[in-house]
Amino acid sequence: MARQRPTLALGLAAMLLLAGGALAQDTRFSLDFGYQWLDVTGNEDLYRSQVNQDDGFVVRDFHLSNLRAPGDVTGWDRLVIDAAGLGASPYGYLRAEMGRAREYALRLNYTRAEHFSALPALANPFIDDGIFPGQHTFDRTSDELDVNLELLPGRTVTPILGYRYYRLEGPGETTFAVGQDEFLLNEDYDYTVQELRAGLAFNLGRFTAAVLQGWREIEATSDLTLAPGAEGGNNANPVLGQDVTMSSYSRTSTTDGTSPMTHVYLSGLVTKGLRVYGTYARADQESRYQEAESLSGDLASFKISRFFSGRDEVAAAKAKADDWRGQLRVEAALGSNFDLVLGYDERHRALDGTALVESLYTGVSTFGGLAAPDVSRILDADTLGDRQEQQLSARLIARVGRPLTVWAEWASADQDILVEPDASEIVVPGNQGGSFERSLDRLAAGATLKFKRLELGLDWLSDEADTVVMRTDYLDRERVRGRIGFTLFKWLRLSATAAQISAETAIPGIDSDTETEQMSVDLDVTPSDNFNARVSYSTYDTDSTITVRIPQDLSLVPSLYLAEGELWDVALNGKVAWFDLTFGWSSYDNVGSFGFDFEHALVRLDFDFSKRVGIGLLAESYDYQEEVLAEIGDYLVKRYGVFLRLHN
C-alpha cells in the first residue's frame, strides 16, 4: 500500500541540518520520526477515502526554537520551526518564523495534503453486481506555500509583503452522458493559484489600521479520455434497436482567471468606553474557459432526432464576479454594568457570464436508417446574477452583580436579488428568474451565571423571513442552547451542553422541515500534572424533509433524511519517570438514512533512555462498518509504528 511521498526526505534532511547548525547554541530542539506499517482488511479504497494513513517513514513532530537577547549580532532574535505529518501521512506541514524585534518578521507556512475518494456506492450503477468503487473518484495531492514579510513591525508604519502558491493535481474518474448512454472517463486534473500581496499596517496610538492589496491568478486544466473497457457504456439496452457504443473520446478544457483583492481594517479607541471596528474587503474576478471535445461511436440523440457516429464540439465562456463586503461595529460602555454593541454589515455580489458552444454531428442517419446531412448546433447563453444585502444589529449586555450576565440582540437584514438566466438553461417553466426581495429579522437573548464552582449558560435565537428565494432558504428558524459546568474538586470537572435547532419553510413545492437535537457530557479528571483522564458522551438526532424534483420525469417527491448518532470518547494520559503512556478509544454509532459504526483505538508509549534520546511505540486501529453495504462498506485497519525521539 506504500505510496511515495518525496517531501519526507527533503523535510527530514532540512530539519537535521537546521538542528545540527543550531544545537551548539541556546536552542530548544525535538524530533520524533520513524516507520509505520498497516494491516488492512476489507475495503482499502474506503479506508483511504476516510483516514488514508500509509506505510512508510513519517515525521510525527519536529520543533526548533532559538531565542536571542536583543542586540545580538546575528540576523534574528527569534527563530521557531515546527513540522508534523511529513511522510506516510495524508496531511503534513512545516511552519517557520524568524525575525528581529521592531526590524522584521518573516513567516513561512507549507502544507501538503492528499485528497482521495473512491466510495463504493457513489455514482455506481454496477454495485448490485459486486463491482466497486463507484465511477466518480479522485486521487490528488495539494501543495501550498505561504510567505509573509513584515518590515519594522510594531512601529508607526509597517510595510507588508506576501506570496501564496497553491497547486492541486492528480488523476480521477468521472462519467459523461452522451448518445443516450453514460460512459466512464479518465481525468487528469491540474489546478494552480498564485497570489501576490502588499500593503501597510499603521500603529497610531489608540488606532490601528491596515491596507492590503493582492493580485490572484488561477489556472486549471482538465484532460478527459475514454476509460479502457468503457466502450459499451453503463446501459446495455439498445436505443431504437441500435446498440449504443463509444469508440473514442477526448476533451481538453482550460480555465484561467485573475482577481485583484483589497482588504482594509481599522480599529480604535475613540474615547474612554467607546471603541470602533471597521473592515472592507473586495475581490473582482474575471475568468475565461475554453474547451475542445471530439468523440466517435454508434450513438443516438433525441435532441436532433438522429443516430450519429461522431461529434466535434468547441466551447468558450467568460465570467466576471464582483464581490465586496463592509462591516462597522461600535462598542460603547454605558457605565460599569452595561455595554452596547451596534453593527452595520453590507455585502454585494454580482456574477455576469456568457457562453458559446458549437457542436457538429457527423455520420448522421435518421431513426429509420436513412442517411442524413451533418447537423450543426450553436448555443449562445448570457446569464446575470446580483445580490445585495444590508444588515443592522444591536446587542445590549448587562452585568447584574458579579455572577450574572444577561444579553439581548436584535438584527434585521434586507436582501435584493436579481437573477436573469438564459432561456436555454430553463428546464422547468416558471420561477427561474426575476427580481426578488427578502427580509430577515432576528431576536436573540442569553444569560450566564458564574459561581466559584458552578457555571450555567442559556441562549435563544429566532430568525423569521418574509419569503424564500432559494430552495435552501428558510422562513423560520429557532435555536436553544444550554450549558453547565461544575468543578467538584480542583482535579475533577463535569460539564454538559445541549442544543435544539428547528427550521421550516411551509411553502408548497418546498415543504422543508428540519429538527436537530444534540447533547454531550464531559468528565475531566486531572489529579496531578502527570495524569489526565477524560470521558465524553454525545448524542445527535436530526430529521430533515424537503420536496425534490426527480430529474428523469421532473416529478416532485418528498425526500427524507434521518440520523441518530451516539458517540463515546475516552482519553487517558499518564507519565511516570521516563515513561509516557497515552490511551484513546472512541466509538460512533449512527442509524437512519445512512447507518454506520466507527470505532477507533490508540495506544502510544514513549520512553526516554536519557535526556536526549528515546523511542516511541504506537498501536492504532480503525474499524468501520456500514449497515447497507455489508462487507464492501467495511474495513479493519491496524497501524503500528516505531519512532526515534531526539531532544535537548
Model-found features: residue ranges?
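Gram-negative and organellar
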Residues: 26-29, 35-648
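Sec/Tat signal peptide C-region and signal peptidase I cleavage site
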Residues: 20-24
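Bacterial N-terminal signal peptides that target proteins for export
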Residues: 1-10
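Bacterial N-terminal signal peptides
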Residues: 9-19
